[in-house]
């Protein structure tokens, strides 16, 4: 199935790490078994977020994928940014600082050079839309993500981001 107007194709079902890896399931063998069944069943899309078990979801799921020896180019990996990762005032939201620092930490935890999709996990009313769009555009242009998108944004918020990106020569969600 095609993702939006991009050329990226994903399985109809994805395997996500929310409330699972690092929380209800912590045993790496069990995680590897789940990931193996998913991959053998045709799932190529593996979804995460930095805040899932404070980074453990990213670590454990991708460790299982590495252990299974699935070539990176056969996978579609995503992660998200927004929620607090610590008590630090800047370690949350969609500021340029948080977006750029979080992608690097996610890539390190996931043991990969890039994610296929990097999502704004929620809308951040405290950050100017231009800052958000420019930061995500920079992540894509730097090769750390191939696409960026949104999660739980309104249609109006997405339309604003797309219009701003087009008007500014930036990468749109």
What do the PLM-derived regions correspond to, one by one?
Residues 1-76, 113, 141:
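N-terminal binding-site loop/beta-alpha segment at the start of enzyme catalytic domains
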Residues 52-54, 84, 157:
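Short, active-site-adjacent cap segments at secondary-structure transitions
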Residues 60-64, 76, 80, 98-105, ...:
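Generic beta-strand or strand-like secondary-structure segments
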Residues 24, 36, 86-173:
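Glycine/proline-rich, positively charged
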Residues 15, 48, 79, 117-120, ...:
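Conserved beta-strand positions
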